[in-house]
């Protein structure tokens, strides 16, 4: 796909803009399990009188159709109540001169390779060099930087993957070197990845990994705030074995939060009892054992959660930030084993 092709595509279909960008950046390697998280569904239900909306999730979701195994999930202390927040956002856009300044910080020429005109008067500024591409979105403000062939830049290099503490420090240093603010973000998660020609797999063995992904989010009263999807946090940095940043996504937000209502939460026992019936599988990646197979996302035939945590999430199409439980663990499909994330509304009926 050429940049002109991309321009035409984006003008026709704004909802798939991040997917199209991802195609340019990675050659499609991440699409197998991430493309569904890039699609935006219709806005979730929101009450005209300001009532708390029903939990829904952006992008495709799946269910746990088979067995739920709780043997590896330790009982977790969860709060009995929390606050639902209303979100206010002041719209700020990145201008072309600002996009050019950002490009210079990443050692690109100031002149964009292409300008893509988006609906509502917004733009995407594309910068390209021999090995790397970058897209700067005017609004919502976002930077996406990546090597054109991430697989080659990870699979064909040698070295030792950073440990988590070193990686967090290096990620912050990298962002600060590009003059990207880090004061309002907190570390969220680490994933050891195996980039291969066919797909991206996840592993718990750092020695098997050829890339390390770190994600950062905003937090409120100590609780993390997810983005619209679990695979699209506020900041995502991917290192290869040599410590080179091979992929970066960085979003800026101008949100403020005001307390709306104190609500009661499901207990640990109530949450686990409800997980199979009401949980939504929101992301999955093949395990190392399944990385050679073509796995199409589908309902899980089994799920073994290993952790459960309370996080916040803004329901699509609403101004409400609500609490949800996020469970992480291993699941199975007919085609193989995956690492999966399952979201469940934390609000007690």
Where are these regions (language model features)?
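Segments that shape or occlude catalytic/ligand-binding pockets
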Residues: 154-163, 167-325, 329, 333-336
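Short, solvent-exposed coil/turn segments at beta-strand boundaries
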Residues: 130-146, 239-244, 321-322, 348-349
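Short, low-complexity, Pro/Ser/Thr/Gly-rich segments in the mature regions of secreted, periplasmic
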Residues: 331, 336-349
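Preferential activation on post-signal-peptide N-terminal prodomains/segments
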Residues: 1-216, 220-227, 251-260
């Amino acid at each position: 796909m050429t940049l002109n092709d991309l321009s035409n595509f984006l003008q026709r279909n704004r909802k798939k803009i991040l997917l199209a960008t991802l195609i340019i950046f990675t050659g499609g390697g991440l699409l197998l399990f991430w493309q569904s998280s890039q699609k935006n569904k219709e806005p979730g239900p929101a009450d005209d009188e300001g009532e708390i909306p029903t939990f829904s999730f952006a992008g495709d979701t799946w269910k746990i159709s088979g067995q739920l195994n709780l043997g590896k999930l330790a009982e977790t202390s969860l709060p009995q109540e929390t606050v639902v927040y209303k979100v206010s956002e002041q719209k700020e856009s990145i201008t072309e001169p600002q996009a050019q300044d950002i490009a210079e910080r990443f050692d690109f020429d100031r002149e964009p390779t292409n300008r893509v005109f988006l609906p509502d008067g917004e733009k995407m500024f594309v910068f390209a060099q021999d090995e790397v591409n970058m897209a700067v979105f005017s609004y919502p403000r976002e930077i996406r930087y990546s090597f054109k062939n991430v697989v080659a830049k990870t699979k064909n290099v040698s070295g030792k993957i950073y440990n988590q503490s070193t990686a967090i420090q290096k990620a912050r240093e990298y962002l600060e070197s590009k003059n990207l603010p880090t004061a309002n973000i907190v570390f969220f998660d680490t994933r050891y990845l195996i980039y291969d020609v066919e797909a991206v797999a996840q592993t718990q063995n750092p020695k098997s990994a050829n890339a390390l992904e770190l994600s950062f989010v905003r937090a409120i009263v100590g609780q993390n705030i997810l983005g619209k999807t679990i695979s699209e946090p506020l900041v995502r940095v991917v290192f290869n074995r040599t410590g080179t940043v091979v992929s970066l996504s960085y979003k800026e937000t101008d949100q403020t939060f005001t307390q709306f209502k104190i609500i009661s939460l499901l207990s640990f026992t109530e949450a686990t009892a409800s997980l199979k019936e009401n949980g939504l599988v929101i992301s999955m990646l093949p395990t190392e054992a399944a990385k050679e197979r073509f796995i199409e996302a589908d309902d899980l035939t089994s799920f073994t959660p290993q952790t459960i945590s309370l996080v916040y999430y803004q329901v699509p199409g609403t101004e409400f930030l609500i609490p949800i439980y996020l469970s992480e663990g291993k699941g199975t499909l007919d085609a193989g084993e995956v690492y999966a994330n399952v979201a469940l509304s934390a609000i007690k009926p």
